[in-house]
Amino acid sequence: MKRIFPVILIATIVLLSACSKSPEPTTLINCDGLITDTLGTGDNGRIYIPNAFSPNNDGLNEIFRPVTQNIAAIIFTIYDQNNVVIFTTSVLGYGWQPSLQASNVAKKYYYKIQATTASNKKIGLCGEFHSLTCFPVNPPRSFYYFEDMLTPNGFTGVTNESLPTCY
């Protein structure tokens, strides 16, 4: 028994030292520091943000912007895939309209929002969105929701956006 204990102890140490923590998922923008303190307060400030827009000069879903209700102030920032700020505004209702993109392009960008409601509460959001001049094969078209799909109940219905499929 006295000889087995050191063997078990050494084997356990070797096995534990061989284990490594799995890497954390990579997020290109830092969402730390965003504050949301509206939960459970009955505050009716809302921010709706699509996950796609189509700057293709067809007059539909050309601008990427948050749609707000009962929001008094906002800081809205957009980052490219290299974490470079490409747009920022503090004007409610204002959004990003990039120069016309080439056809058959699907690009991913990131946003960060810190807003103050009319009741002086905070809402912080961050995430990714897609600039589309065509629909990629994956994910399916149903993955994307555009500003024209927004109703008083959130994003419902079908977009009027008619884009070709990217190949």
Where in this protein do the model-derived segments appear?
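Short loop/turn motifs at secondary-structure boundaries
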Residues: S22-Y167
